Amino acid sequence: MSNRTALLGKKLGMSQVWDENGFFVPVTLVDVSTNVVTAVKSEESDGYKAVQLGYGQVDPTKVTKPLAGHFAKAGVTPRRHLAEVRTDNAEEFEPGQELTAELFPEGTLVDVTGTTKGKGFAGTIKRWGFKSYRRTHGSHKNERRPGSVGACATPSRILKGKRMAGRMGHVTNTALNLTIVSSDVENGVLAIKGAIPGPKGSIVLVRSAVKGA
């Protein structure tokens, strides 16, 4: 574990900017305003060090009493989304502290975690990239079938992990080592180079890169 900083945000969409060499660079815009520390975990009280973040406003009348007490203890208004990030420097934060895009200046490498777009039930060709059968003589209604899924008597079952048709997407995914192209502290917007998981309006967690240089 290292001194990792993080912000919760909402994916606004994609755009493009010019770089210093005159090339278009695709960027994803993420709104990271209204981030606040709602709790700080320590080894003495919790057995590990971590910081809990809150993001987004929510109607106070729609918050459960336990959560309302949790937010009141931190001295903040109720937040819609919460996330916990383990870090060695958790003692440097305090409940109620507001966090801004200033945490990630231009050029910083970050990891972005989000939920991918859900595609619904999909076959093996779309889900796993299987090759289709040839559409020619002797092949009858087999074009998109998965083929054999295992032996008959031995092991007399389908092995766990077999790639088959099923629900595709809507899973947690992390894009590693993305570069912060610009950090707009005033408006609370980060421009991150490349694409990040999830559709527009989805909630993402931006953390300092764990494998970055």
Swiss-Prot record:
Transmembrane segments: none annotated. Pfam families: Ribosomal_L3. InterPro entries: Ribosomal_uL3, Ribosomal_uL3_bac/org-type, Ribosomal_uL3_CS, Transl_B-barrel_sf. Keywords: Ribonucleoprotein, Ribosomal protein, RNA-binding, rRNA-binding. It comes from the Bacteria. One of its GO terms (molecular function) is rRNA binding. Signal peptide: none annotated. One of its GO terms (biological process) is translation. Part of the 50S ribosomal subunit. Forms a cluster with proteins L14 and L19. Belongs to the universal ribosomal protein uL3 family. HAMAP family: Ribosomal_uL3_B (MF_01325_B). One of the primary rRNA binding proteins, it binds directly near the 3'-end of the 23S rRNA, where it nucleates assembly of the 50S subunit. This is Large ribosomal subunit protein uL3. The lineage of its organism: Bacteria, Bacillati, Actinomycetota, Actinomycetes, Bifidobacteriales.
